[in-house]
Each structure stands twice: as C-alpha cells, then as structure tokens.
From Swiss-Prot:
Identification of the protein by name: R-phycocyanin alpha subunit
Family the entry assigns: Belongs to the phycobiliprotein family.
Subunit record text: Heterodimer of an alpha and a beta subunit, which further assembles into trimers and the trimers into hexamers.
CDD domains referenced in this protein's UniProt entry, alphabetically: PC-PEC_alpha
Keyword Electron transport tagged: yes
Family matches, as InterPro entries: Globin-like_sf (IPR009050), Phycobilisome_asu/bsu (IPR012128), Phycobilisome_asu/bsu_sf (IPR038719), Phycocyanin_a (IPR006246)
Originating species: Synechococcus sp. (strain WH7803)
Binding site for (2R,3E)-phycoerythrobilin: 84
Length: 162
C-alpha cells in the first residue's frame, strides 16, 4: 500500500540515495498531523453506526426512488437497505484506513481501482454515495485539525465519484 512516506522511501532506495531534506521535512509534517488523523479515525470509528445509518437515510431522503423501485440495487427491502448501509460503511472504513495510513493508498488500492466497473455492473449511482459522504462530512462532529484531516479524505472519495 502506497503512502507519501512509503513512496519517498521507495524512490530514495531505488535511486540508491538517502532521503533528501525535502523528503524528511514531508515525513516530519506527516508525523505532526498524525495525532489529528488518529483522533479522527478513532472518532469516526466510534460513531460509525450512527454515521452510516444517518448517511443512508440522507440518500433515501434525497433519492426517494431508491426505496420505491424493485431490484437488488434498491432499498425497497431490508436486505436492500442492509446493502446500502454496508456500502456506505465501506467508504467510511476506507476513510479511517487512510487516516491511519497517512495517505490515500488504502482507498486507491481497495476502493477506487474498480469503482466505475462496480457501479456500472450493479447499476449503482455514484450520486448516492456522494450524498452519503456529504452527510458524513457535515455530521461527523470533528473540529480543528482532526476535521481537516478527515474532510480531506472524504473530499478525495467524493472527487473520485464525480
């Protein structure tokens, strides 16, 4: 899994050199932000159920047809609603992984790589997940540096969807 730190080390090693002062400075900056990232990951994990349920409800409110149309990709049944919550939870989990890793590697490797194909195959609308992520961003309750760190990965996920 790639992170800015592993990328810097890999580049230096492949070139047979020590880390440059710029690379060391970037690593130092990451370590300075690490406490806020870990705080955000912990808070999002603790609130995961409430955030996921609220985000799913936000999708149903904005796109009421998702609870009215028949089909396995809609939320007309308890199973369909469970799938929606599972998918929203997966996005939230990837965000917490990115916060812990200090980079977008987990999301790039485990989510974004096949996102278009999955959405197309299962006829899932990216706008549903954008709405869910906007809800999470507006309701996570974080502030300060922890909010800044979390919001950067939420925005990254949103931008991958649009």
């Amino acid at each position: 899994m790639k992170t800015p730190l592993t990328e810097a080390v890999s580049a230096a090693d492949s070139q047979g050199r020590f880390l440059s002062s710029t690379e060391v400075q970037a690593a130092s900056g990451r370590f300075n932000r690490a406490a806020a990232s870990l705080e955000a990951a912990k808070a999002l994990s603790a609130k995961a159920d409430a955030l996921v349920n609220g985000a799913a409800q936000a999708v149903y409110n904005k796109f009421p047809y998702t609870t009215q149309m028949e089909g396995s990709n809609y939320s007309t049944t308890p199973e369909g609603k469970a799938k929606c919550s599972r998918d929203v939870g997966y996005y939230l989990r990837m965000i917490t992984y990115c916060l812990v890793a200090g980079g977008t590697g987990p999301m790039d490797d485990y989510l974004i790589a096949g996102l278009d194909e999955i959405n197309r195959t299962f006829e899932l609308s990216p706008s549903w997940y954008v709405e869910a992520l906007k809800y999470i961003k507006s309701n996570h309750g974080l502030s300060g540096d922890a909010a800044t760190e979390a919001n950067s990965y939420i925005d990254y996920a949103i931008n991958a969807l649009i």
